[in-house]
Amino acid sequence: MKRILRIAALFALATAVVPSGATAVEGDLVYVASQSAASVSVIDAGTQEVVATVDLTELGFTPNCKPHHVAVEPDGSHWYVSLIADWRVLKFDRDNNLVGQVEFETPGMLSIDPVNDVLYVGRSMAAVSPPMRIGVIERSSMDIEEVDVFFARPHALMAAREGGRVYTASLAENRMAAVEPAEEVLELVDVPGNLHTFVQFALSPDGQTLVAGGQMSGEILVFDVSDPLQPELKQSLSIGGHPWHPVYSPDGGTIYFPQRTSNAVAVIDTASWEVRDTITGGGLVEPHGSAISADGRWLYVSGRNTSGEYGETPEGATPMGTLNIIDTQSGEVAGVVDVPAYAAGVGAATR
């Protein structure tokens, strides 16, 4: 069996725990939000080592602030994290200095508009009855406006490639929306089938195909968005296992879906819409978030590991979270980075 490299992220002294300060890394960085530990781990994608752990309590946020999702500027200059329980979206620079924040009730998923000065924010899955609105944040000022979407629990969220538009979908009903906030345009789309509970989208590199995962249905739903305000369901595929946060390969030929209750990642061919491979092992326990390197070689998948199935947990301690570094050429977990408890959203710059 191929040996898996395990890189211990410090819960002790080898990794700096910082509220701010220079990361001092020239290459790409990967960010992992630890929802039960009020921290964000910063990982050097080149060395696959933790270079900083941002302790949010040192910045005045509560121990139960629940950092959930991370979005990173395309050039890596700033990154954003949603705090479910503290009702905040935070903005950090590359050196992990907190440079802005805005209040938003129970924030969940984040998505950066690649053209405009906008960050979109949806509602957390933990929110039972949040406002039927998404947030539209001006990134430079961190000012926010809320936009009605007219359905309950808007969670899945993805900005369009051409800018000015965002797609969102409901946890509570089979409904999604295409929204152009600046134009005050909103188109609602009803999706057939039993309750899907849409967790998150992935958008193809050419911007023509939007893919959603249904927690309750276990289905992958493929929408044609060539008519951008009228997503059309073209195909569905049952994979089970609670499909979570997906990501496309840069060439568009593959989409990777963490399967949270199957401890696996489904590798789906986008030409045939069939499962090509299933990745298991390493620290893929309750896999949650995902990101991919700009060249498509490395896939980063977080593992909540709340069951403690991976690693050794001292008596009375909380199990560690994980970031799994997957070699997309071999389809194997090449390394596991230990991070604080309940590793959730993953963010990386996309060029």
Language model features: what each stretch is:
Residues 13, 21-351:
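Predominantly soluble domains enriched in secretory-pathway, periplasmic, or organellar proteins
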Residues 8-16:
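Bacterial N-terminal signal peptides
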Residues 1-8:
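Bacterial N-terminal signal peptides that target proteins for export
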